[in-house]
Regions:
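Glycine- and charge-rich intrinsically disordered segments
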Residues: 49
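Non-catalytic, solvent-exposed segments at the cell envelope interface
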Residues: 2-43, 52-100, 104-464
């Protein structure tokens, strides 16, 4: 069936662009002339019959001559009319302000209460121990480095140390901690608890005397009325290490403290078994009882050197504890301070110093946290033997090796000190020719052992 001739739209031919009719929006835009009032921008123009485009003088299509203002256009100098705005209720800003103040007040009150609670727990008693200025860091280096003596007070079952319960216990864990704030490092020195200090009476370089009932360093505080300052002065005199603050930890409270943390993840380098307690090698979550066994054990397989091997094992606990604290963050740790300092820890540090230490600690990379121990000559038996007592088994400090260790790692702010300048008793007691190793390690190395155990699947931690 034939069709009529198709009409060709010549406007679309020869690649000529199609003429588009202005939409309402574009038409409205065209009539928004300068100087006209705003209300015209909201007024819909009346429908208009489309007009053919006018020819410009040059014969081209388009031009500005065809634009006409709306029928109701106002004079150019007509007054501008503003939109009416909804009035904000008078009470609304006041309510918002009060709400914000209430929130801020609540936060401030909570923070102040927490700080006051911590400060109350940290306030020393009237007769609290204080360290003499002579053993502290030189004034010119204060703020760059802080040196802290950390001692674990152990209460061995069945032994009555004194009639005053607050003075019971030996300092079986002695840890010298140097916070190098300026250098971004933490260096820790373990001193074996049975290190010989001299006879039962210790005479310091300045003429002061202190007692040591068992000849060993762990009895100094107890032998002098539980005064931790006495131990600090002995360490300063014999090792020439400045001490600014002390921290004592109740080792019997370790169980509760670890349980309050929800356990501590620790890498155990070898199987442990003694007196019915067993821990298997691997990355384990230790509860309080297991942690106590881990840090106190010094017998059984892997403990040929008894106390020295125990010091090496305790490093893995420190590494696990450090990792846990760093993962908690400063805010969560501060929230734990009232419980910790009220029940487990005593110190002469104020809250500002503790907060500064926490912030500094969280910024220290594990590769800059170092552990070492003082080299000693092993096996000096029967010290103080009597007809009814076999005596004590002690170790003799190796002054030469200790001087080298301390000059390498711990005397950045004091300068080197020779073995002769220290007041150690190396030459006062018989000993062998070979001493133990300083066993310098960094926590980053210990963390890697934990990571390797996790990667190999040797862990009881779900998702580790």
């Amino acid at each position: 069936m034939s069709q009529g001739p198709r009409h060709i739209n010549t406007d679309r031919s020869l690649n000529r662009p199609t003429e588009q009719r202005p939409t309402e929006a574009s038409a409205l835009h065209q009539v928004s002339l300068s100087g006209q009032p705003d209300f015209f921008q909201n007024e819909q123009p009346a429908p208009q019959r489309p007009e053919p485009p006018r020819q410009s003088a040059g014969g081209g299509r388009g031009g500005n001559g065809g634009s006409q203002p709306p029928r109701h256009a106002a004079p150019a100098d007509a007054p501008r009319r503003r939109k009416k705005k909804k009035k904000t209720p008078v009470w609304l800003p006041m309510a918002v302000t009060l709400a914000v103040l209430a929130v801020i007040s609540g936060v401030v009150v909570y923070a102040v209460n927490m700080v006051n609670k911590v400060e109350d727990n940290l306030k020393p008693e009237e007769n609290a121990t204080s360290l003499v200025e002579e053993i502290q860091t030189l004034e010119e280096y204060k703020g760059d480095v802080v040196n802290i003596l950390v001692c674990g007070i152990d209460y061995e079952e069945g032994l009555a140390y004194s009639s005053d319960g607050s003075n019971d216990g030996m300092t079986d864990m002695i840890l010298y901690c140097q916070f190098d704030i300026k250098g971004g490092a933490l260096r820790m020195l373990q001193i074996p608890r049975n290190t010989l200090v001299t006879n039962r009476k210790i005479t310091l370089s300045n003429g002061k005397t202190y007692a040591a009932t068992n000849y060993q360093i762990n009895s100094v505080a107890l032998s002098n009325g539980g005064d931790i300052a006495a131990l600090a002065e002995v360490i300063y005199d014999q090792y020439k290490l400045p001490i600014d603050y002390y921290v004592t930890i109740d080792m019997q409270a370790l169980v509760e403290m670890v349980d309050n943390f929800g356990g501590i993840e620790v890498y155990i380098p070898h199987d442990m078994s003694f007196a019915g307690s067993v821990l298997k090698q691997g990355y384990r979550n230790l509860d309080g009882a297991s942690a106590e066994f881990f840090v106190r054990c010094r017998h059984g397989e892997g403990y040929a050197n008894s106390d020295i091997d125990r010091l090496n094992m305790q490093r893995y606990f420190y590494a696990g504890l450090f990792k846990r604290v760093r993962s908690m963050g400063v805010t969560d740790v501060i929230a734990q301070l009232p419980l910790i300092f009220n029940n487990y820890i005593h110190t002469d540090m104020d809250l500002t110093t503790i907060a500064k230490m926490l912030v500094s600690f969280t910024r220290i990379d594990s590769g800059n946290i170092m552990l070492a121990q003082t080299p000693v000559f092993m096996g000096v038996p029967n010290v103080g033997k009597t007809s009814s007592f076999d005596g004590y088994s002690c170790v003799v400090p190796d002054a030469g090796s200790i001087a080298e260790l301390l000059n390498t790692y711990f005397r950045n702010y004091t300068g080197p000190v020779s073995a002769e300048e220290m007041n150690l008793v190396t030459n006062n007691w018989p000993h062998g020719t070979a001493s133990t190793s300083a066993n310098v390690q960094f926590v980053g190395q210990l963390d890697k052992e934990s990571d390797d155990a996790i990667l190999s699947g040797d862990t009881d931690e779900a998702g580790a």
